Regions:
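C-terminal motif of bacterial Sec signal peptides marking the signal peptidase cleavage site
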Residues: 27-32
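Tryptophan-anchored aromatic micro-motifs
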Residues: 43-66, 140-155, 160
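N-terminal glycine/threonine-rich, aromatic-flanked beta-hairpin/loop signature
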Residues: 60-104, 193-197, 202-209
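Short, exposed beta-strand-loop hairpins at the edges of beta-sheets
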Residues: 115-118, 255-272
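Surface-exposed beta-loop interaction hotspot
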Residues: 122-182
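Surface-exposed loop/turn elements that mediate protein-protein interactions on large endomembrane-trafficking
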Residues: 207-217, 270
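Surface-exposed loop and turn segments in beta-propeller and other repeat-based domains
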Residues: 213-231
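Acidic, glycine-rich flexible loop segments
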Residues: 225-259
Length: 280
């Protein structure tokens, strides 16, 4: 009799916990659906009227300079290095989808006036212009040169001697379309992505007709000597031909972080047997 009562009690407990589990599962499902609907609702609540009003070219009222042009769902900057950015407006907030998304509180937006709070907490006042001459400000090309090698094909070759050895060394910087984005703040106090382009550098050394080295270098090839965090931010700017010694032919690879004073210089030595040694 005692065992029968225990078994009945156990069955009741099991049934109770099964009901609790079903209830929790159902509640989670309802909650999940609710969140999904809320997310969809938020997605639909973008202020399309505000987006329509912000279209056009905007001038900084204090400085008289061109701040940006909004066209469609994209903002374009007059600075040739600054990348165009997707934007959205929800309620009184402007969202910019940079590499690191940012948002700005809108104080006032009309057909011809925009006031918002920038990254420093300062109020920025802009006025829309209908002057078509400002369109030319946005019809620019990327600069051909900066403090780093950008968009330039650079070729070098030289003949060097070390003792009785005579070497023919080559170096060629090949531009690529691979972007390295660096976030900065423009004159209006708005975060913008500035785009720089990486390079691939080909080097070769010949002892007569024998190739000691003949290969491409990318910035990732130096990750053993340079921190990975820096590799992600830097450009392989150049590999220069330096000299020939008893050790071999010396090159220097220059890895530079755009818009900063930091760089790594890597010594590359190719010996008479084609062995490569790299040091900082």
């Amino acid at each position: 009799y005692y065992n029968t009562r225990v078994r009945k009690a156990l069955r009741c407990c099991i049934a109770f916990f099964m009901l609790v589990g079903i209830s929790v599962s159902f509640s989670c499902s309802v909650s999940s659906c609710g969140n999904s609907k809320t997310s969809e609702k938020q997605e639909q609540e973008e202020d399309l009227q505000a987006k329509k009003m912000i279209q056009g070219i905007w001038i900084n009222e204090d400085q008289g300079s061109c701040a940006f042009r909004a066209k469609g769902d994209t903002i374009f900057y007059p600075d040739s290095l600054s990348e165009p950015v997707k934007f959205r407006i929800f309620a009184d907030t402007l969202f910019l989808e940079n590499s690191q998304s940012t948002k700005y509180h809108i104080l006032k937006l009309t057909e011809h006036t925009l006031r918002f709070v920038n990254s420093d907490g300062d109020e920025v006042a802009l006025s829309k212009t209908n002057d078509k001459d400002y369109l030319a400000v946005f019809e620019h090309e990327k600069p051909k040169t900066t403090d780093i090698n950008q968009g330039r094909l650079i070729k070098r070759d030289t003949v060097m001697t070390a003792g009785e050895k005579r070497f023919h060394a080559y170096s060629q910087v090949n531009p690529t379309t691979f972007k390295v984005l660096r976030q900065s703040v423009n004159e209006e106090g708005v975060s913008v992505d500035q785009a720089y382009y990486d390079n691939i550098v080909h080097i070769a050394v010949y002892d007569g007709s024998k190739a000691l080295i003949n290969r491409d270098y990318r910035k990732g090839d130096f990750s053993r000597l340079v921190p990975k965090e820096y590799i992600a931010r830097c450009i392989l700017s150049d590999i220069t031909i330096e000299k020939a010694t008893a050790e071999g032919v010396h090159f220097i690879a220059i890895l530079t972080e755009p818009d900063t004073y930091t760089s790594y210089h890597i010594n590359i030595i190719v010996d008479a047997n084609g062995k490569v040694n790299m040091t900082i």
